[in-house]
Structures are given as structure tokens and as C-alpha cells.
Regions:
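Signal peptide processing junction and immediate N-terminal pro/mature segment
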Residues: 36-43
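A short, Lys/Arg-enriched amphipathic alpha-helix followed by its capping loop at the start of a domain
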Residues: 97-105
Length: 344
């Protein structure tokens, strides 16, 4: 069987359990906007938002592709949008944005290989199975099996890098591309310095030879979420769902392999495309964190958008409030801009 589907599954149960705690004793019923704002101030923002998204139905699937299994969450009906998370999150990071986009689209949120509930393919000495090229090809297979030969593609962090690679390697598959808070791998490494290394520490630490970085992550799986790089305003139960990935040594090794690929073979793939003047020709939206590293590191390059326009001539975008994880921390503004992008 290609994939097994379960409606309102264990993952939704996790969300419901976390969300309903916010409602206990409140007798909220249907929230007006004013009531929601007041409630958000009085309770955890995660819980308050949840009262509005908890009624949105979604299914979960395990899709078998080329010897691996990809876990996904599916919302809505209509033209397809594929959402791809980054480090250190899973598909759960889209829990607020996905329902907004599902009003007139089918929204597919995947766990990348090794993350969350997806499979963990064996790696090789050249890290090719965890290259962005291999991961992108896998996602194309997923969408083909789901019956979506073309789709809008949105990626954040590592998922953004898988997404732009997919758009370069499979241009006929991607109708529109949105990449959140990253620049191309080659461009990031070519501009790296001490400030880069201190800010983007996972690039440096996790790309080291096995098993040094694996030992650090497994030894303190919650540490990354206490760091500004991974911190968020989510509830304890959502945090526990994220952290569970880093308690599994096989998953941690797979994640480190992806970072090793980003320091080696992914750079080669980017360089080959740049030297061949290969470009992303579909419409592209780039959003980045206001006041974050992309907003401050690359001013001399006309900002991150200036860098992206060397790769995607139709790119446009802006800075966003909410930090690196603005799709999760500021889903309202993110949703407005993505919907505008989809309507053009």
C-alpha cells in the first residue's frame, strides 16, 4: 500500500490535549477577535491561537517513496501547497499557517527524512542521501503519489534550502516558490566569518565528522530549544514533540548528515548551477526576520533579496516580525503575505 491514512490521529490528539488546557473553565464558545486578543494576553499565545485552529480537520499519512517513508499532515482541498520545515522543527511548525492556507488549497506538511515521524535512510560517505538534491527528489515523489504533478512550494530554514533546490532541479513541478529566512547555501558559506559561525552554530557544529555532534545533541536534546536559535513561545507539549526527534540517535545522525551535505556536496551542486547561470524562473517570495542575521549581515549585498535575485530574477519580499520562526510566531502576517502571493 502506498500510504496509510488516519483522520484526527495521535498528532492531532497531542495538539488537542495542549490546546484544550487553555479552554478549561473559560466557557469561551466562539471567540470574537476582541475576545481572542484579550485571551491571548491572559494565556499562553500558543494556547489562545489554538482555540481557532483546533476545529480545522486534517489527516495524516505515511507515504512510501524509493525505500523511505515520509510522514505528512494534510489540510483542505484545492490546488496543492507543500510546506517544508527546517531545523530543529517538524511539520508541526505549520500548525497555525496551514489552516489559513487550506481555505481554498490542499496543504501538505511533511516531516523531512530523519525528522519527526519520517523514515531514516542510511547515509553514505559522500552524504548524498541527505543532500538537498536527494531530499527534493523525494518530495517530488511524495507529491506525485498524492496526485499533485505541480504545486506551490514553501520552505523555512533547512526546508527552504530543500525547496530552492527542488525548484532548480524540477522547475516544471513548481508553480510558485516561497523561501523563508535563508539564502542559498553557496552564498552563505562564501560570506561566512566569525559572526556567521557564532550565529549559525549548527552549520559549524553539526557538520563535523561523526560522532562528535551526535553526542552533543543526544546528550542534551532540549538544549537547542533553550538557545535563541531554536527558542519559541510554544507550549510544553509542543516542545516535547519537537525534542523527541533529538532523543533518537538514528534521527540525530540523519540530521547531522544533512548538515554535512550542506558543507560539501550541496555547495558543489549550487556552484555548478551558478556557473551554468541556471535560474529559478517561477514567481518567488522571500520573507526574512526583521532585525535578524539576514537583515543585518548582508546590507552590502542589497540585503537577502539582492542575493536571491541573482538566483531568482522574479523574487520579491520583505522583512517580518517574529524572529527566525516567524511562520510559527507570526502566522497572521505570514498568512496575509502568502495569500497575496498565491493570488497573483
Amino acid at each position: 500500500m502506498e500510504f496509510a491514512t488516519g483522520s484526527r490521529s495521535e498528532e492531532e490528539t497531542l495538539e488537542r490535549r495542549s490546546f484544550l488546557g487553555a479552554l478549561a473553565g473559560a466557557s469561551l464558545g466562539v471567540l470574537s477577535e476582541a475576545t481572542f486578543i484579550e485571551f491571548a494576553r491572559a494565556q499562553n499565545t500558543e494556547q489562545a491561537r489554538a482555540t481557532l485552529v483546533d476545529q480545522v480537520s486534517f489527516d495524516t499519512s505515511q507515504v512510501e517513496v524509493s525505500g523511505n517513508t515520509i510522514f505528512l499532515r494534510r489540510y483542505g482541498k484545492g490546488p496543492a501547497i507543500l510546506l517544508v520545515h527546517g531545523f530543529p522543527r517538524t511539520s508541526l511548525m505549520w500548525r497555525f499557517l496551514a489552516p489559513k492556507l487550506a481555505e481554498n488549497h490542499t496543504v501538505i506538511c511533511v516531516d523531512l527524512r530523519a525528522y519527526g515521524r519520517s523514515g531514516i535512510p542510511a547515509s553514505t560517505d559522500d552524504h548524498l542521501p541527505y543532500s538537498k538534491r536527494a531530499m527534493a527528489k523525494e518530495l517530488v515523489e511524495v507529491m506525485d503519489k498524492l496526485g499533485f504533478p505541480t504545486f506551490t512550494l514553501i520552505g523555512h530554514d533547512r526546508g527552504g534550502r530543500v525547496s530552492y533546490r527542488l525548484a532548480l532541479d524540477h522547475p516544471k513541478k513548481v508553480e510558485r516558490l516561497a523561501v523563508f529566512d535563508v539564502i542559498p547555501i553557496l552564498e552563505a558559506w562564501s560570506r561566512s566569518d566569525a559572526r556567521f559561525a557564532q550565529t549559525y552554530w549548527p552549520w559549524i557544529l553539526l557538520s563535523q565528522k561523526a560522532s562528535l555532534p551526535e553526542s552533543y545533541l543526544i546528550g542534551a536534546p532540549k538544549a537547542v530549544f533553550d538557545n535563541p536559535f531554536g527558542h519559541g513561545s510554544f507550549s510544553g507539549e509542543i516542545l516535547e514533540e519537537y525534542v523527541s526527534t533529538y532523543r533518537d540517535p538514528a534521527r540525530v545522525h540523519g540530521i547531522c548528515e544533512e548538515y554535512r551535505a550542506a558543507a560539501t556536496i550541496d555547495v558543489e551542486h549550487d556552484r555548478a548551477d551558478k556557473e551554468a547561470s541556471k535560474r529559478i524562473e517561477c514567481p518567488m517570495l522571500h520573507l526574512w526576520a526583521e532585525g535578524g542575521p539576514l537583515d543585518t549581515f548582508y546590507a552590502k549585498d542589497s540585503g537577502p533579496l539582492g542575493i536571491w535575485r541573482q538566483w531568482a530574477p522574479h523574487a520579491h519580499g520583505q522583512a517580518m516580525k517574529g524572529g527566525h520562526f516567524f511562520p510559527e510566531e507570526n502566522p497572521d502576517d505570514t498568512g496575509v503575505l502568502v495569500k497575496q502571493f498565491l493570488s497573483v
